[in-house]
Regions:
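Conserved nucleotide-binding/hydrolysis micro-motifs of P-loop NTPases
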Residues: 22, 28, 55-59, 152, ...
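C-terminal helical "lid" of AAA+/P-loop NTPase domains
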Residues: 233-239, 245-260, 299-302, 315, ...
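Pre-Walker A adenine-sensing motif
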Residues: 2-14
Length: 383
């Protein structure tokens, strides 16, 4: 995957437009790590790179304008940029004043601006991207935005981003996006723009298997002089299901309990760390997400865990909760909005966090819905 991404970067640097890329998968599969690794590949390339993390307290348009200022400033030193600088800067001023009025870096009156933005984010972001793309083309640069947690973008923002990328592709401009997010981003992109599937390469990031899983365990230990027996490796891969974050946490728990002089890790060392491994996951990785749910939402996810298999249908969840589908549909929507679950197909849902149903079983072994309130209060499985 990293090698393919490097080819995409090399190709766009040579002036050939590239499809943007969306990496999607469950929590803990290494999407952000991959995105960061691709970013590092741009260090020695003529690529202007911006990392955008979508979060409640981090404004998308503000992050776009901040990076755009840096990109335009850097390109402005090129002799070939002189015919573009004033026009692109003027467009950026208009965009900034409209969408980020609290930004005081551009104190400019309407009469001083050549460009007046429309107030339609899709049109205005497209104008900005096209202007920067043309400037990059003339100055020998490519522009790449890396967007993490892309599923949290508002639909209006995603529609604008897709429209801007689409226009840049039509004009064969060297500007592309690498995005990473949960599986629900596929449905969102299809919803906002029907042609999204032509604009993006969608690459699923899943659990590691075979040699990749072994490498994730063995290679970090090599600089420390450590090694694993084959039996220990098999046990770790089985216990973690190959999920990179789980491998990291289990190996960390193993190393914490090793004798300082020990270099070979065996099956007993792995077994001795398993309890600590699950305690760490339950108190952090899982609990952080569980605590964001309301009591009713918790009943919903416990009912999901009680289904015979996952993904499960919402009708099955309703049956377990002894209610109608219409009564629990709002909880489904809320949980999807919180990125706790996602729709895997027609009327089917699953958790976005690997093995989340097993965590719920550790909290409430019998998965009794009438016990959820006790779990909520910490009477079962807390700390």
């Amino acid at each position: 995957t990293l090698e393919r991404a490097e080819k995409y970067l090399n190709t766009i640097v040579l002036g050939y437009p590239q499809q943007s890329v969306i990496y999607y998968g469950l929590r803990g599969v290494g999407k952000t790590v991959l995105l960061n690794a691709i970013e590092c590949k741009t260090d020695d390339m003529p690529i202007l790179m911006g990392h955008i993390e979508i979060a409640e307290k981090r404004n998308f348009t503000q992050q776009i304008t901040n990076y755009s200022k840096k990109f335009i400033h850097k390109m402005s030193f090129k002799e070939t940029a002189k015919d573009f600088v004033s026009r692109v800067q003027d467009l950026l001023k208009a965009f900034t004043v409209t969408y980020n009025p609290e930004d005081q870096s551009f104190k400019v009156g309407m009469e001083e601006r050549e460009y007046i933005v429309t107030g339609d984010l899709s049109e205005d972001l497209t104008d900005l991207f096209v202007a920067m793309g043309k400037m990059a083309d003339k100055t020998g640069y490519a522009i790449c935005f890396f967007v993490d947690e892309i599923q949290y973008m508002k639909e209006e923002e995603i529609a604008a981003l897709v429209n801007a990328i689409h226009r840049c592709n039509q004009l064969r401009l060297p500007l592309m996006i690498f995005g990473a997010g949960l599986p629900k981003i596929l449905k969102t992109l299809g919803k906002v723009k029907s042609y999204s599937e032509r604009l993006f390469r969608f690459e699923e990031i899943d659990a590691l298997s075979g040699q990749d899983a072994k490498d994730a365990i063995v290679k970090p230990a090599e600089p420390l002089g450590g090694s694993y027996t084959e039996e220990a490796l098999r046990w770790i891969i089985s216990e973690t299901q190959g999920y990179p974050y789980f491998i990291q946490e289990l190996c960390s728990a193993i190393w914490e309990h090793l004798n300082p002089e020990q270099t070979v890790i065996g099956i007993d060392d792995v077994k001795g760390a398993v309890l600590k491994f699950y305690e760490n996951l339950d108190r952090g990785f899982y609990r952080l997400r569980y605590d964001r749910c309301t009591p009713k939402e918790k009943m919903f996810i416990f009912a999901m865990a009680k289904c015979e298999k996952l993904p499960c249908s919402i009708s099955n969840v309703a049956k377990i909760m002894e209610t109608e589908v219409s009564s629990i549909s709002p909880y489904r929507a809320q949980l999807i909005n919180k990125s706790m679950i996602y729709a895997t197909g027609y009327a089917e849902i699953d958790f976005t966090v690997p093995e989340f149903d097993q965590f719920l079983k550790r909290l409430n072994p019998e998965l009794q819905l009438d016990e959820v309130e006790k779990v909520q209060k910490g009477d079962a499985g807390d700390e």
